[in-house]
């Protein structure tokens, strides 16, 4: 017990020794502010105390062979504020000597009284106050720059506990107020961020759809494994035209194709007559395409040889009828048939214009007339033979200037037998 009491008395005596030479009225800072030199700080300090600067371990820091003494005051910058927001720091400076006094007199007299001078003005929003060591009654002052200072309370022993408790209560009040302000600032910043995102992120629905269509490459399901891809240029996304311009058909529908009937025309020759099966051609609907393959060509050559064998060398036949027989086997063919396949579904056909009905009817009439011509010629030949037999019997009676009917029929082969008697 004696050792503990002796330690406490030694600490108190040491502290008194540090504070006694520099002790002054605790209201000196308030009196200085009331003097009118510092007009902005009209309101008196809320709390004022004397401190000495120590290090983190509690050891006193000496400056010019003495302790660094400082007066700390917390006050309002304006009467409208409800909570203090300013921290003031003041130091004692020795008073100026008079010039009239001689050096000898100045040495004999006591030193002049020290004067309190305001040296620092710190807003509390840039300062953090906390209790560093409650046993030694030291506080920690941390600035916004990161530097920290440790201050130990310096006052008379019977006032230390009361005054230090006031500082602890003030520090807790200031910290609570800082926490509220920080929360309000965070909420305001978050609201500002949400508002900015609402403003900048607000987009029209049409804008959203256009951007999704531009980001995805257009893929047209053409027929087959090939796909048509088109990349969009952003400044020209409004000028994009549809690529499905082949036939403007949906993807799943198959275009209707007109029926194309391939008909092979078979020609039969019976006794120098060409008979064509025209009934199939007239009844078929759509486009009639005639293909002549090698077999048909061979058949035609054989028919021509048969015609040569059938016709007698002494038979009279006009050259015009031969040319008509040759020309009778005309075939209407459709040329320039181009089939363009796009994959497996789409195709285009380009055909030459189809002949008119008048031309087809004319050809049919020509064919029927050609069929009738051989019959008519055969009857004419028979009549000529009978007439030649009759004329041979009457040659003696006829005069020499009259020509035989056979020669007349050679000139006019199309006349019938009754008209030749005239």
Curated annotation (Swiss-Prot):
One of its GO terms (biological process) is flagellated sperm motility. Keywords: Cell projection, Cilium, Flagellum. It holds the Pfam family GARIL_Rab2_bd. Residues 353-404 are annotated as: Disordered. Expressed in spermatozoa (at protein level). GO terms for cellular component: sperm midpiece. It comes from the Eukaryota. InterPro entries: GARIL-like_Rab2B-bd. Residues 360-374 have a biased composition (Basic and acidic residues). It is found in: Cell projection, Cilium, Flagellum. Interacts with CALM1. Seems to play a role in sperm motility. Belongs to the GARIN family. This is Golgi-associated RAB2 interactor protein 2. It comes from Homo sapiens. The gene is GARIN2.
């Amino acid at each position: 017990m004696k050792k503990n009491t002796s330690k406490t008395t030694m600490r108190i005596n040491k502290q008194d020794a540090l504070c006694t030479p520099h002790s002054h009225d605790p209201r000196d800072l308030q009196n200085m502010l009331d003097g009118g030199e510092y007009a902005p700080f009209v309101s008196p300090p809320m709390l004022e105390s004397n401190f000495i600067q120590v290090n983190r371990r509690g050891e006193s820091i000496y400056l010019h062979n003495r302790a660094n003494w400082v007066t700390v005051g917390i006050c309002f910058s304006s009467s409208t504020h409800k909570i203090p927001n300013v921290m003031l720091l003041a130091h004692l400076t020795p008073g100026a000597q008079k010039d009239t006094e001689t050096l000898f007199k100045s040495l004999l007299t006591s030193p002049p009284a020290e004067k309190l001078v305001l040296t620092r003005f710190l807003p509390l929003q840039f300062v953090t106050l906390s209790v560093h060591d409650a046993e030694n009654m030291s506080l920690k002052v941390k600035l916004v720059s990161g530097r920290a200072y440790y201050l130990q309370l310096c006052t008379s022993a019977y006032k230390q506990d009361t005054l230090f408790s006031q500082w602890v209560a003030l520090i807790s009040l200031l910290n609570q107020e800082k926490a509220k302000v920080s929360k309000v600032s965070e909420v305001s910043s978050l609201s500002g961020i949400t508002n900015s995102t609402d403003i900048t992120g607000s987009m029209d629905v049409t804008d959203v759809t256009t951007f999704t269509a531009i980001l995805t490459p257009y893929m047209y399901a053409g027929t087959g494994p090939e796909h048509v891809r088109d990349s969009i240029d952003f400044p020209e996304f409004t000028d994009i035209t549809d690529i499905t311009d082949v036939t403007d058909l949906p993807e799943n529908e198959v275009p209707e194709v007109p029926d194309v009937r391939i008909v092979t025309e078979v020609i039969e020759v019976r006794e120098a007559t060409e008979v064509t099966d025209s009934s199939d051609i007239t009844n078929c609907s759509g486009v009639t395409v005639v293909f002549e393959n090698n077999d048909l060509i061979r058949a035609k050559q054989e028919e021509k040889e048969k015609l040569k064998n059938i016709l007698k060398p002494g038979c009279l036949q006009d050259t015009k009828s031969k040319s008509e027989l040759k020309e009778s086997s005309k075939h209407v063919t459709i040329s320039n048939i181009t089939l363009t396949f796009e994959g497996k579904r789409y195709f285009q056909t380009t055909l030459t214009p189809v002949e008119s009905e008048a031309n087809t009817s004319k050809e049919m009439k020509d064919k029927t007339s050609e069929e009738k011509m051989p019959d008519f010629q055969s009857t004419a030949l028979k009549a000529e033979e009978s007439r030649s037999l009759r004329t041979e019997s009457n040659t003696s009676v006829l005069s020499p200037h009259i020509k035989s009917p056979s020669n007349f029929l050679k000139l006019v082969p199309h006349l019938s037998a009754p008209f030749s008697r005239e």
